[in-house]
Amino acid sequence: MTMGRDRSLLLLQGAIGGVLAGVGLTQGGLFWMAPALALLWSVSRSPGVSSLWGALAVLLSHRWLLALHPLTWIGVPAVLSFPVAASIWLFCGAAAAVLVGLWAWLGTWLAHTATRDGGFRAKAFHLLLMASIWGLAEVLLARSPLFWIGVGGSLLPGDRALAGLARWFGAGGLATVQLLIGWWLWQTVLAWRRGIGAFKSLLIGLLLLALAH
C-alpha cells in the first residue's frame, strides 16, 4: 500500500513538473522553470517518471506543431494532414522523454557507482556532474535536428539579467545554472520538511541568485 502511494506521488510530481516546464518553455523566466526542475530532481531516481516529465514538457510547449495542420500547402494530402502533424508532435514528445529518461538513468547509475559513499563531496560532485551533463547535452543537441529541445533559452524573455550570463558560457551554461537552481530549491523543501537548515539554505540560495543578477 505504501509503495503504491509513493509511486502515485512520484508520478504526480513528475506530471506537475512536466506541465510547469512546458509553461516555462513558452512563457520564459525562472518562475515556472525553477519549481519544474526542482520536481525533476525529486523524481530523478525514477527514469520512467523523469521521462514523463520530459514528454509533458515538450508536448505542452510544442503544441503549436498541431497548428501546422492543414499541411496541404506543402503537398500533404488533406486526409493525411492531421495524422502527420500529430505524429511530428508526438515524436518530439517521445524524443524528450527518451533524453530526460537517459539523463535520469545515468544519474542513478552514477549514484550507485562513482558517488556511492554518500559523503558531502560525493553528493556535490554528483550534482555538478549531472547538471553539467545536461548543459553539455544541450550544446550537442543545438547542433542536431533536435536543437529545439532544451531549457537553456527558457530564461528569455522573463529573466534577461540571468540570461545575460550566456555571454560567458552560452546556452548550455544557462541550462546548467537552472539545473543547479532547481536542485537548490528541491533541497530547501527537503530541509523544510526535516525542520533543519531550511532558512539557511534559502538565504544562501537567494544571495547567490542576487549576485548572479
Task: For each feature predicted by the language model, list its residue ranges.
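Membrane-embedded alpha-helical bundles of multi-pass enzymes
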Residues: 2-213
